[in-house]
Amino acid sequence: MTLLIDAHQHYWQPSRGDYGWMPKDDPVLSRPYLPQDLQPSLEAAGISKTILVQAAATIEETEYMLGIADATPSVGAVVGWIDFENRAHLKHLERLKNHPKFAGVRPMIQDIEDVDWMLRQDVQWAFAALSDLDLAFDALGFSRHLANFLTMFKRFPKLRAVIDHCMKPQIRNHNGTRSELAFWSHGMARLAGETGAYCKLSGLVTEANEDWSAEDLAPYAGQVLSAFGPSRVMWGSDWPVCRLRGEYEEWLVAAQTLCAGLSQADRAEVFGGTAARFYRVS
């Protein structure tokens, strides 16, 4: 039987002090989120494993997450962080690889001002190392990064890459600007067709209006499923960030609605099988 897997969630403790992006007064985000907070939702949904993803640009947070993973059976894998601009961090990558739940890394590219950062010569070693060590790369960005991710995934064809949050299409703006939707759709189709990258069906609600519905998300989910195919798409909650627009269960039900037209076998891929293969969770 295929495991049900949440391919993208976070645990954090703001008092640790390294979540530079986090608004200090946000009533939803600026509070601790720990395994005991998510466990009831996982049990209610029948989800056996999750992929715990970094939320701070520090090695210390990666170590913190691995400690949580050691004590939390539901955490199937951890996506951490290294400094791509510091070649000395190769030793961290090689050391972290020895942890049985360490799966790969995610640089916080969406927060980097230079859209061409990933093309810089001084960060190429990190992409090469991930490829050589057979570790996963979570691609976090916006539509403006699509062309550069295409370049990088072609440059490193053995890199095991997954696109986070469908590359964050700005759903709340697309109702009035169809050209933006077309730009995102074209870029995603090229990534799907010209590289072996995977895609997370996650983060869509956060990019939508507060009164979002599954119907609002359908063009985006449909494009991802059509372009990548269910065997390269994995559902993720993006909890607790999803709580900016709705609770865990609301997004899960919406995602199930968006995938209702798939066969049972394809739904099993999106809600577990793909993530299990990509992150090597059993």
Segments the model singles out, each with a brief description of its role:
Residues 9, 55, 166, 238-239:
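Active-site metal-binding loops of divalent metal-dependent hydrolases
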